[in-house]
């Protein structure tokens, strides 16, 4: 991106009420068959339009065609049985009913490539596309086949690499891997987590990003955050390894969190998507609040490597709130952009 402080969203945006139940994760579709296909594309267009109206520079699909950032990808793979479910502990903090790996996992056909081509036809702006990361995928399943988290992660990394290469060919500019599990399983991150992420990006010429956050604004996550104390230093565990990795961009949570801003120093040299919008409450930030977060970040990251962003996806928020937050993100970035240009 040539523009200084290009804005983007971390992931999902709210779906329209005619497509799925608002403010709900894993909400079932309200349409079926051809109507659902058309409805998803209509929602994707609408999501793009709202990003453009807000002045977002790097746009996305708003994850309008998927029910969930992890399970929708897994649904398209062989070797996973969604009828045969088990209850597992997700991110080591809440129980969920998840599908079971019953055989060798494989991707017989592209998952999101047609959606990406459709989005590419709608805009000339840079596009970022999010995929679940290998470690977060294995943490959202019960494995009755490989019986090894690491082995399954390597298999998913190969599959993600196939998908990512086709997304790149479809015109995607940045491919982001969502890895909230990196904030929880520190030994695995350093033993093989970052290595499997490297496998997922192997051979890509487009830019790559990893998004690590403290989750959506749902009760299980907000309750967990209350146990983390006055300083959240989880990033300290993964950042040194990521700093040495081939990943181009690291996306992290900042605003209204207890993450010490100086931890960004640990990924010096990387581009940093700084979360300047809190997704865990309905209060809409002022542009000045956004600008303050960005000014603090600029102490630890060069201006040409700072990408203002949201802390996480906004699927569970009311559309009005998400719209207001996107507007604040753009306006706050513009304040700091002007300050930087005037100082030159």
Short names for language-model regions:
Residues 1-344:
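Domain-level signal for soluble alpha/beta catalytic cores
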């Amino acid at each position: 991106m040539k523009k200084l402080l290009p804005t983007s969203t971390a992931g999902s945006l709210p779906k329209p009420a005619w497509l799925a139940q608002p403010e709900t994760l894993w909400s079932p579709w309200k349409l079926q068959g051809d109507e659902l296909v058309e409805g998803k594309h209509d929602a994707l267009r609408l999501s793009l339009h709202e990003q453009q109206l807000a002045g977002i520079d790097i746009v996305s699909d708003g994850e309008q065609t998927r029910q969930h950032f992890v399970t929708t990808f897994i649904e398209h793979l062989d070797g996973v049985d969604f009828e045969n479910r088990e209850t597992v502990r997700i991110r080591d903090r809440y129980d969920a009913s998840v599908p079971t790996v019953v055989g060798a996992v494989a991707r017989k056909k592209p998952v999101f490539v047609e959606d990406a081509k459709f989005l590419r036809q709608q805009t000339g702006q840079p596009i970022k596309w999010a995929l679940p990361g290998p470690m977060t995928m294995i943490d959202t399943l019960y494995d009755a086949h490989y019986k090894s988290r690491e082995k399954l992660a390597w298999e998913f990394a190969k599959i993600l690499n196939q998908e990512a290469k086709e997304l790149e060919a479809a015109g995607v500019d940045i491919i982001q891997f969502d890895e909230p599990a990196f904030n929880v399983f520190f030994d695995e991150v350093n033993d093989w987590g970052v290595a499997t992420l490297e496998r997922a990006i192997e051979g890509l010429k487009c830019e790559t990003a990893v998004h690590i956050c403290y989750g959506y604004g749902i009760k299980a996550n907000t309750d967990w955050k209350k146990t983390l104390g006055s300083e959240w230093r989880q990033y300290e565990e993964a950042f040194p390894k990521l700093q040495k990795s081939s990943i181009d961009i690291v996306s992290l949570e900042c605003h209204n969190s207890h993450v010490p801003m100086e931890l960004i120093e640990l990924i010096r040299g990387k581009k940093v998507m700084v979360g300047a919008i809190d997704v865990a409450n309905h209060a809409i930030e002022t542009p000045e609040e956004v600008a303050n977060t960005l000014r603090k970040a600029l102490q630890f990251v060069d201006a040409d490597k700072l990408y203002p962003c949201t802390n996480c996806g906004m699927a569970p928020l009311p559309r009005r709130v998400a719209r207001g937050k996107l507007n604040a993100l753009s306006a706050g970035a513009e304040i700091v952009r002007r300050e930087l240009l005037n100082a030159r």
